[in-house]
Amino acid sequence: MNNIHKTALIGTGYWGSIIANTLIKITKKKIIIYDKLKENSSLLKQKFKNRILVAKNCNEIFKNQRIENIILATHPSVNYNLGKRALLFKKNLFVEKPIVTNQKQLSELIKLSKKNNKILMGGYIYLYNSYIKKIKTIIKKGELGQVKYIEIQRKNLGPIRNEIDSHFDLGSHDLSILKFLFNKKMKITNLIKRNILKKNISDITSINLNIGNIKCEIISSWLNPTKERKIMIIGSKKMLLFDEMNDSNKLRILNKFA
């Protein structure tokens, strides 16, 4: 049992396979995984051979006393039930975003994690991005002056989701960034949805919100021919441009103001 890692993975699709790759890289121990689609877990088993152990079901992972941490890389529709069971079994829990799609379920999971003194963490990786941290420092030091407007664009061609809109899939990252930068209450004033491919799923969305006197817009799309990850901040002294896809000059401060 000592050769089994304390972290198990449930869900080995697109993001789950990426997480599995990372787990394999950072440890020499075996990783327990489970996916209801056997072909997904079989692909990882074929790739990593004896480094992967495939559980028969989720309960096998929940009841395993060796497992202390569970990563959920599953659909939002099942995250609540799986997450609740993991916390009831007193496991620390990391959930790929969005954790859930309604406030009531999220509140219940938070309450349960606190009750059992366990970690509940969402997959908001930009909170650990060095450029985002630098932007926060620039704002805090007042280099931009009074921040007046922020526009964030997150676009690419796919992957197209079947259960959630693009603002849940992509825009949730940007909401977490804004929360990190200012740590203030955000008030959504408008949400525009464009359903292009399916009637009930929004492929392109625009969220308008206020953070105090700061006006913000978050544009999300998985129907864009190129991958874009951009943040523009307009201040009373200077402007800031962050282009994550620009390898040569990601972060610029411009001597322009409004």
Model features per residue range: what roles?
Residues 95-96, 120-122, 242:
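Hydrophobic residues in well-ordered beta-strands that form the structural core
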Residues 1-48:
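N-terminal Rossmann-like dinucleotide-binding module
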Residues 172-252:
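Contiguous beta-strand/loop segments that form the cofactor/metal-binding neighborhood of enzyme cores
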Residues 19, 53-112:
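Beta-loop-alpha module in the N-terminal Rossmann-like domain of NAD(P)-dependent dehydrogenases
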Residues 77, 100-158:
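A contiguous active-site-proximal alpha/beta segment in oxidoreductase catalytic domains
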